[in-house]
Amino acid sequence: MRYIDPHLHTVLLDDGVMMKIALTGMEACVIPMFHCLNGIFEADAVLTLWDRSVDFELKRGGTIGYEAFVSLSVPFLGLTDKGTDECLKRLPDYLKNDRVVALGEIGLDVGTALEKRLFRAQLQIAKSHNLPVICHTPIRLAAHGPEIIRQVVSIIKEEKFPMDRVILDHAGESTFDFRMASGAKVGLSTCFDKMPPESVANLILNNRDKLDRFIVNSELASGDGYFTVPMVALALRRARLPYEDIYKVVYENPKAFFKLPLD
């Protein structure tokens, strides 16, 4: 089945991996910026990643045979204060690229003052550029997850950003109902530290009247989890969910949310 992976960190994946992913049926992907960096860096490190995303990654997608789109942001961990301010200043220029379809990952992980400042600033940038956002939230097993997701939603509302243009990513069972009640899209990340495919499929099957609310993604950045989105689709097929409903979840929903120019 053809699908779109709306959260795929291709900058960390080699050509062989991307070929395997394309062979599973992925026709397009959205490449988000990481929410954190491993170390302490100045602005040049982030600008280099942005440049790769809007140049090499787009060309590589065309060469291998999938459409690549980009979501950019300033990470809330791993930059000096000077680097953070410089990236915020430079970000609007990068958003002029037609293949930049969102801001993200933005959001909160532990709720520090810096995270909140950056989150608010980038929500305003997204609003001024009429772009949706991909919001990072704590992994499903994080004890502080329920509290942080409440803070995330509160900040979005305080900044008057439209909830229907938000993906609250990395959903877990304990925060699922709250996310659904928020009015945002619910990001069902399917990877080793988020949810397994069967859990994602069960949430979808138990909410068949709300299929338009789900965004299924792999969040793949390393390892061999090439097949997680197709595995969700297969689990839904085994449960006899109609083909058109599965297609809606794994293709039509991300296409519509990001307004991707695809068939």
Which residues are covered by each model-predicted region?
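Mid-to-C-terminal alpha-helical segments outside catalytic/metal-binding sites
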Residues: 230-263
